[in-house]
Every structure is written in structure tokens, then in C-alpha cells.
Amino acid sequence: PLGVKQGDVIGFSGNSGSSMGPHLHYELRDTRTQRLYNVVSAGIIRPDDDLPPRIMRIHYIEVDTVQGIPVHSRPESYAVVRSAGGSYRLTREEPVGAGRKGYFVVEASDRRNGVGNTFGLWRLALSADGKPLFEYRMDGFEQAQSRCCDAVSYYPLQLTSRNEVIRAAQLAQSPACFYPVMEERGIVRTEAGQTRRIRIEAWDDCGNRSQLEFDILGRTASFRAEADSAATALTP
């Protein structure tokens, strides 16, 4: 490790023309484990920020299993509008239709005072009827888990979105360290005709919070995938 103190010159930086000017990236790690720290949530750096995260929209994806192979429906998207402060609501009044098993995807973004940059969420939680089902939290991770960071996102939507797109469910290979709360991998179960209350909360790493609440209603007809006799199942 290189020891430095305030006022030391640690290097000189140029500009290739694409970075808007010379700048420095840095990170703090635990020496023994090489675990990366979130320096803002840990209180090491305190930026000026009283702006709660922005919840842009949500998506619902129904899931099923065919002959042991997991399948899913296309995402159903719902617009969101801010009602007051950090409180949000859906633009529709009627409940969101839900199948027997499914999960939600949340598109959100965050800003800080005085800068035009956008930032990711620190924490996202989902509960159904007051019972916590899912929580994602980014306090840091070990270097070996860097390749798993995109596992928390819903990548098909993340590719074209300018926001952070977080899957409120755990993929099979996604590290458990990202999820301090996880019930049934985040799957929301809904019986036909059953009404449930969903609450989604989003925090930034300065402690600002936004929330969205809405009802879901169990459909009588659910997503059912059928096996394709002409298809070949490939496994890694």
C-alpha cells in the first residue's frame, strides 16, 4: 500500500479529449479482504445532497417453469408520477394485474445538489402487505465479485435505459451479499382474485428516501408457457 497525506502529489493527469478534463478516480478497500467500501454510506465522504431518488417506472414480470426450465413473460410497464416530496404513485387508478408468481423491476435514478451527474441507488426494498420480501443494498463488495454487479439489474431493459434498472428478485448466481433481506428470491405470489398491497422504497447513500405504494390483483388467467417439441435446451 502507498501511504499518502493531504498535500502530497501522487501523480500527473492529462486528457485524451473524451473525459471533459483531467480527473481522478479512487477507491477505498479493506486491506485483508480487498472489499471495496461505499465511502458515502460509510460516512467517509458527505456530499451536499437532500434530493430523494426519482422512481421513473416499474415493470412486472410473471414467471413459470416448464419441464424444470424457468421461463418468464414479457415485462408489463407502468408509468409513475411524483405526488409529494419523495412519495410516488402509479398514473393508473386500477390495481396492477398479477399472476401466481412474478417479480417487479424498478427504474430509478438519483441526483445530488449542484451537479448534473446521475447516480445509482444505495438501497431498494419491496414488501407485500407489510411483509419484507426483498432488499438490495450496495455497501461494497470484494474484488472477485465485480463480475456479478450487473446481476442485480434487469439487463434487457438496462441496455437502453438512462436510469438504473434493478430487478427486485435474486438471480440464481447473484451473490447473497447484495441482499440483506430475501424471501423466496423476491417472488410475489398472488392467488386469483386476491388483492395485495405493494410498497417499494428507494434510498440514496445520503439517507434520502422515496416510496411508491400500489395494489395488485391476482388474475384468473395466468401466464403459462408450453414446451416446444422442436426446441433444444442448452445448459452452460
Question: What are these model-predicted stretches?
Answer:
Residues 1, 82-87, 120, 125-191:
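Exoplasmic/lumenal beta-rich domain surfaces
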Residues 196, 200-202:
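Hydrophobic/tyrosine-rich beta-strand signature of extracellular beta-sandwich/beta-rich modules
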Residues 120-122, 205-229:
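Short beta-strand elements
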Residues 19, 97-99, 117, 189-193, ...:
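Surface-exposed coil/turn segments at beta-strand junctions on protein surfaces, enriched
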Residues 2, 27-98, 103-110, 115-116, ...:
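Acidic, glycine-rich catalytic/binding loops that coordinate metals and/or anionic ligands
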Residues 11, 30, 110-112, 202-206:
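Surface-exposed loop/turn motifs at beta-strand-loop junctions within extracellular Ig-like
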Residues 13-27:
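Active-site loop architecture of trypsin-fold serine endopeptidases
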Residues 1-13:
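Short, well-structured beta-strand-loop connectors
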